[in-house]
Amino acid sequence: MARTATRFSCTACGESLPKWEGRCPSCDAWGTVQEEATTLSAARRGHAAPREVVALADVDALEAERIATGLGELDRVLGGGIVPGSLVLLGGEPGVGKSTLLTMALAAIAQRTSALLVTGEESAAQVRLRAERIGGAGDIRVVAETDLDGVVATIAKERPAVCVVDSVQTLWTADLASAPGSVAQVREAAGALLRVAKEHGVAIILVGHVTKDGAVAGPKVLEHLVDAVLLFEGERGGELRILRAAKNRFGATSELGVFAMTGRGLEAVEDPSALLGRDELGAVGSVVACTLEGSRPLLLEVQALVSTSCLLYTSPSP
């Protein structure tokens, strides 16, 4: 017999509370504590079987072969490719090109192994239109689904090498009374996908939108669950896109990937320093400095403009 339990959580930081409060004691945000209703099964409480314990020295230390995405800039940030069984979160503002980036990666992966795209924001026909624009609609398998249980069952049945879920905010489960995109729904979806990824060795990439507060997929509870957090950034109206890792359990977090958005999708920018105008280097008021982002040197140009003034300035009195 199932019973319903009520708890409270902060929509800003994800902190769980035993009762409602006007201000969250963890992040000091006002009016962010909301009620959550969860369903508990009485048949499962207190009936968990003990698990087998092994010595750490007896565990096989075989390093799993990474799955190359076919995009050099993405592989650079990931540390050489996607690790099987890992859970990766790709965050960025809406419209920056997250779906385009992952569709291109899936198209390259599908030529060598199985790849699955779970879409909750678009229909299968809309996904095909985008894939045809970038020239990779052939081998990608796609399913349009937002029910969490259905998504988990599909991944467990298909067992693709790489699966992309676009996006995590659209997933929901009937076990929770809150709306899709809430703290409880996002946390439950990430936990369920983490379990299926580890159990079946499927590399899962979650797409999460950045909120107005700068958090990826809502509160930061997701960032503690996943193995890697990638941030995809770009200026509004500009063509350059920057990919960086905020967290990576299987590689460095200092690497940087640079892309350019074109009519055929994203193109890798292997030498960002070449974007500087060679003819303008050495001009008056301009200086070029070199900085290091991971293993990549980057040239940065700083400009200063100085002109004469018509105003009269008096010298300070001694």
Predicted feature locations:
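Short, small/acidic-rich helices and loops at N termini and domain boundaries
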Residues: 2-45
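Extended interfacial segments that mediate partner engagement and assembly in macromolecular machines
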Residues: 37-117, 121, 125-126, 144-145, ...
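Conserved P-loop NTPase
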Residues: 40, 44-56, 157-158, 169, ...
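Conserved inter-motif catalytic segment of the P-loop NTP-binding fold
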Residues: 85, 93-96, 100-105, 109-195
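Conserved nucleotide-binding/hydrolysis micro-motifs of P-loop NTPases
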Residues: 96, 121-125, 146-149, 169-171, ...
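Conserved P-loop NTPase nucleotide-binding/switch module
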Residues: 162-244
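Conserved small/polar residues in nucleotide/adenosyl-binding loops
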Residues: 313-318
